[in-house]
Amino acid sequence: MHRAVDPPGARSAREAFALGGLSCAGAWSSCPPHPPPRSSWLPGGRCSASVGQPPLSAPLPPSHGSSSGHPNKPYYAPGTPTPRPLHGKLESLHGCVQALLREPAQPGLWEQLGQLYESEHDSEEAVCCYHRALRYGGSFAELGPRIGRLQQAQLWNFHAGSCQHRAKVLPPLEQVWNLLHLEHKRNYGAKRGGPPVKRSAEPPVVQPMPPAALSGPSGEEGLSPGGKRRRGCSSEQAGLPPGLPLPPPPPPPPPPPPPPPPPPPPLPGLAISPPFQLTKPGLWNTLHGDAWGPERKGSAPPERQEQRHSMPHSYPYPAPAYSAHPPSHRLVPNTPLGPGPRPPGAESHGCLPATRPPGSDLRESRVQRSRMDSSVSPAASTACVPYAPSRPPGLPGTSSSSSSSSSSNNTGLRGVEPSPGIPGADHYQNPALEISPHQARLGPSAHSSRKPFLTAPAATPHLSLPPGTPSSPPPPCPRLLRPPPPPAWMKGSACRAAREDGEILGELFFGAEGPPRPPPPPLPHRDGFLGPPNPRFSVGTQDSHNPPIPPTTTSSSSSSNSHSSSPTGPVPFPPPSYLARSIDPLPRPSSPTLSPQDPPLPPLTLALPPAPPSSCHQNTSGSFRRSESPRPRVSFPKTPEVGQGPPPGPVSKAPQPVPPGVGELPARGPRLFDFPPTPLEDQFEEPAEFKILPDGLANIMKMLDESIRKEEEQQQQQEAGVAPPPPLKEPFASLQPPFPSDTAPATTTAAPTTATTTTTTTTTTTQEEEKKPPPALPPPPPLAKFPPPPQPQPPPPPPASPASLLKSLASVLEGQKYCYRGTGAAVSTRPGSVPATQYSPSPASGATAPPPTSVAPSAQGSPKPSVSSSSQFSTSGGPWAREHRAGEEPAPGPVTPAQLPPPLPLPPARSESEVLEEISRACETLVERVGRSAINPVDTADPVDSGTEPQPPPAQAKEESGGVAVAAAGPGSGKRRQKEHRRHRRACRDSVGRRPREGRAKAKAKAPKEKSRRVLGNLDLQSEEIQGREKARPDVGGVSKVKTPTAPAPPPAPAPAAQPTPPSAPVPGKKTREEAPGPPGVSRADMLKLRSLSEGPPKELKIRLIKVESGDKETFIASEVEERRLRMADLTISHCAADVMRASKNAKVKGKFRESYLSPAQSVKPKINTEEKLPREKLNPPTPSIYLESKRDAFSPVLLQFCTDPRNPITVIRGLAGSLRLNLGLFSTKTLVEASGEHTVEVRTQVQQPSDENWDLTGTRQIWPCESSRSHTTIAKYAQYQASSFQESLQEERESEDEESEEPDSTTGTSPSSAPDPKNHHIIKFGTNIDLSDAKRWKPQLQELLKLPAFMRVTSTGNMLSHVGHTILGMNTVQLYMKVPGSRTPGHQENNNFCSVNINIGPGDCEWFAVHEHYWETISAFCDRHGVDYLTGSWWPILDDLYASNIPVYRFVQRPGDLVWINAGTVHWVQATGWCNNIAWNVGPLTAYQYQLALERYEWNEVKNVKSIVPMIHVSWNVARTVKISDPDLFKMIKFCLLQSMKHCQVQRESLVRAGKKIAYQGRVKDEPAYYCNECDVEVFNILFVTSENGSRNTYLVHCEGCARRRSAGLQGVVVLEQYRTEELAQAYDAFTLAPASTSR
């Protein structure tokens, strides 16, 4: 069933609008899909493509061609006889590609390739090649214009349809690349059947694999016998909601040949723009506005579809498809498709561009303004499905891994053409060749753009693969690197709007529909495969009461949320080539019997990047924490997180280090909230704005670095015979586990104390484990800054030096900035469900020792959870706990049920002193260990380091765990922790002496104990009270040397208890207490019990580290330098955003936050003495005026200064039209009628009176009210009235002259009013508010106005109204007034006190009256006394009243060609004295006076419940982001406004979080208007309270918090949306600084 599409249409600010019309399939429509083989689709309820899909912009809809190179070129597989003319060009093409395969960095060859394709009119390929040439140093001056011309040609071709069916002469570069690469691999000489002997060349560290890798054919397709064909997903697959379990893949094909050489890196600009991929046959890419056509849905036989279903993807990355080719058949509305595939039912429907009745607030405004880019036809831009579809709860595995994994690209997409035997390359003929529409829809913005808060998981691949499915993707053809899309698209601006509103709200309002679906059948426990998945709580959009769904949902949801984290965040990139190459060649599982008949392999639920499992509707802050994640970069956990292939990592036939995720896979089961490692997390330098490393922490780092250098120098001098410890970075490459994308860098930097010895451990372990069939697991994160581990087993490292130990601590501390990036983490893994040893490179992880979990479970089998399990719980309440319990799955492999500790309640957050005590104890332990190592080097080879140390008794392990295991041991751990806290405080007071450790062994037992204590305990730096004090307890009694470097060391902000905590990272080779169950990211050290942080920036904490040396011992005492807490009332603009967040976070505000946005100390109003009685002549002052004699005068800066001088309320500029040669005839009545005679005119019917009088109807007294009635007509009809009144006036004049009439003032032929009126007033009609905003209809008129000086123009950088972001009729557009004598514009101030420009077109004159803004309150009082509303009423001042009140009135005549500048806040009223036309618009010059008055009126309007037409808070933030302000007064005002706005948002947010109300992130899109409360018309900035009108699913209304709470005190039925992440506002606030005066204007 397809919900009818409502026609798009304009809306008034208060009108509701239909959201339903924006959905292609309807978020709530029941879409009976075609069930894929062996699986049943849920009945329609939730199978729409709405929630969870990222808005995909489609500036250039491609055509549905079947060639991988060109949409309209027949598809020729390698080896297929293809008609290839121009053999010379082909030879040249092959030669270039062969040379580039050897060395991609040859701009000349890339340019040559581009010229080849350009000569054959293949602009897409040419643009790609030119981009590559630029990437490798080509001349931008030469290539830039060429690229622009080609892209423009593509655009024109799309509109003209000229190249829709043009066959290409040259084969696509991708085909050639892959073909030659296959030959290259055949010559590579590697044996099939095992991992490659030799690792291919290292790619550049910072260069991720080109997006081609995303969709590159996995080895199983490109190289395996059954895979040499394009295997796309049918439309059914495309319809599979994201994250559903997949049917089991077929038996894995034989291992592929060795990996290819690294592909050329992507274009440099792609780090922040989505990777682009060529259009595939049938590919539904972001530019297809088209849903799959019915003819394409069922065209493939079921068996072929089943094959495609079962063919797993080997690559977890989405391939955002991008094509610049026009659609060959039809343009379909640009459905904002997202990570989630659309259900089959939805596939067949496109959004028809019907007209929508006027609608309101949220969605239509977004959608109407997200008409995509101008290059898209209206049909193509009709936004469909503003929200991605919610995943059906509990849907059994129904589709192939390819369809289910939103980000795993159909590897067939790239390069490997279908076998010649496959009939019909045309995608309509052979849907088997289609790429998964789902994947194809994962366009660039699918990952770069934000997703709705509750997106159905989709972007993360959940492909479950036979754990070892080997595949070796060919090097991605550079062709896949599409040129960056238009900026609007890159930002997901226009297209995001389409999907981000309705369905997400529908989800929140109406919950998930449809009967619960049973979880996928458990997979029989078999070696090398994941254990049977238990249903777990869905992280999709359904309510918390919905049935559990397969674990896949969690990871996908997390992934989708992680995408949404950054509106501007980088888009997902492929992993570095060495990771990508090693994905496939992993050992295959020992169970090749898995067939399509087997129950679906439970999809690996990959780590939730601390993204909120935002679908659970529990009222907790944790669920939407992700919306504030300060790390937009993690917006792409589309990394090797997919379990489709073994995690990428160096694997070779010869013994060599293998990433822990590879070797120890058998010990690992599917984890509920594992973190998908983000390959680019380390690949690219993190944007400075997100390096939330506080200054204090940075200082600690510096101090530690200095100490490290000193220690290294000393050690090198003292131990000349001992080699210095190897750099910590090298072991990291091999040991780095797949860590949560949010915290991957943390583990990368957080080197455990034994980092120097872990290389050996890992090597041996992984070698042994290499032979075991690992289950499909997320690969370890790429280590951008670290080379892959060395191939030969490294020799045992030398004794650890103080330098290396301090480096470890530094790493721990530095890791905090990365941990902070995981702010909204809803990272919860099933506690105790699977031991974390699979990523701990100790042999105990499956090969030589039983996998240790925690000390208690492994040694005694006791159910106590390990340390890491304690961090796996979210304290956010029931739904999370249910999710953990439901998501637990036993891990296969050596893990026995006895070893799986049951989940326990969340331990209380650690205290500040505990945290700091841990740091000091860690430093101390490090130094002690170093001392022992130097004295007794044999210790370095102790069992701990080698990873073979027997497990200590549980009690000992508990002691050694730094108190964390104890704290996590059971429900009573909270009390024990509190006791420990008190002890630590006492110890801190002592500062030197005893070690208040519960059950700690005496100093005699120190040696064995400290072996495990080297792990540094659990530096729970992310705990709730992370910023607490840290007072250490030194071991030494006598202090010989004390160094007191004081360093501000603010660890990242505390994590509220309501947030789930990321897992801790056990140190490899340590005792079992570190190897407690944890997510796959748990790998290096238990040092980091990562807790998700609150949204605000970290609190700065100054820590003084005191180094105490006594004999051979060195102790660090860490003590907090107390800082005064900042109160919210003490905040000033000098404080940074972190201070603002911290001060306002815990502020308790009673009632509504009502602080002013203006500081009273910043007024710039002129001083006007109102007490002095002015003489009569001064009550009629001369009007400031300027006569322009030349164009030079008009553009003089003096004119701007004069007009905007606060002392001049109004300025008349004479002769402007003549000096600028304005053609005012364009605005004459005759021209207007010719241009658009049927244009609407608002008519005001008035009584004609003298300009300085205003009589009542009886004509007996003057009054203030000036009433008029409103009606409408057209320009043509009013022109007739205007002309006839002029003729009648002329005739009356003649008659009056002849008869000496006593009524000389009668100038109209209409009958006089019948009311008793001695003056015999006449009725006149005033044509007003004629909108000239249509740039096409009024193009000549609007272009003529561009001749004006910049500050007077309708649009300019210095005009605040140009930064509103949307149209305000009459303010930032031109309006026309058609007048007859007596037409009155009653008294008023401009909207929000903005300036105004008015030009008299003529031929008659107008008389103006004006009063300075200073007197508006007096005039308002007059209006009140006369019973008329000052702000909204119609009044005409009595001049005598004003004079009596000592108010001077400026009075002057505006002649044709004169321009009147009405300064900010000026009260004015106008009457026409002749027949004339006027044009007018508003201007907001960036002056302090204008800004102050605008904000004053903004606040006054709120008091009077009047709508502020200009959304000043929204405008202020936009100005702060885009304009350099050099005026100090203006800068202070704007900064203060931003400060108040941040405080308001934070206070409001914290109150909602405390109340347990979810806040859903929904980023803004281009041209999205500001929102106003539907009831009180106040601007609603950032945090929107949305309700469904009358329970309707199609209409949503925005409210302010006050009105929302009046409707429902507990906000039941109200969805809270957040449009800006806290980090976005903080970044903009801090970046807004005073610019040098020289750059002013």
UniProtKB/Swiss-Prot annotation:
InterPro entries: Corepressor-Demethylase, JmjC_dom, KDM6_GATAL_sf, KDM6A_B-like_C-hel, KDM6A_B-like_GATAL. Its main location: nucleus. Residues 293-309, 361-372, 704-713, 918-931, 988-1001 have a biased composition (Basic and acidic residues). Induction: By inflammatory stimuli; mediated by NF-kappa-B. Residues 42-89, 188-682, 704-808, 824-1085, 1286-1323 are annotated as: Disordered. It is an enzyme of class 1 (oxidoreductase). Residues 214-223, 312-326, 396-415, 552-568, 743-766, 855-879, 1306-1317 have a biased composition (Low complexity). Residues 974-987, 1002-1014 have a biased composition (Basic residues). There is a cross-link at K1107 (Glycyl lysine isopeptide (Lys-Gly) (interchain with G-Cter in SUMO2)). GO terms for molecular function: beta-catenin binding; chromatin binding; histone H3K27me2/H3K27me3 demethylase activity; metal ion binding; sequence-specific DNA binding. Its cofactor is L-ascorbate; Fe(2+). Residues 1337-1500 form the JmjC domain. PROSITE patterns: JMJC. Interacts with TLE1. Component of the MLL4 complex, at least composed of KMT2B/MLL4, ASH2L, RBBP5, WDR5, and KDM6B. Interacts with TBX21, SMARCA4, SMARCC1 and SMARCC2. Belongs to the UTX family. Histone demethylase that specifically demethylates 'Lys-27' of histone H3, thereby playing a central role in histone code. Demethylates trimethylated and dimethylated H3 'Lys-27'. Plays a central role in regulation of posterior development, by regulating HOX gene expression. Involved in inflammatory response by participating in macrophage differentiation in case of inflammation by regulating gene expression and macrophage differentiation. This is Lysine-specific demethylase 6B. It comes from Mus musculus.
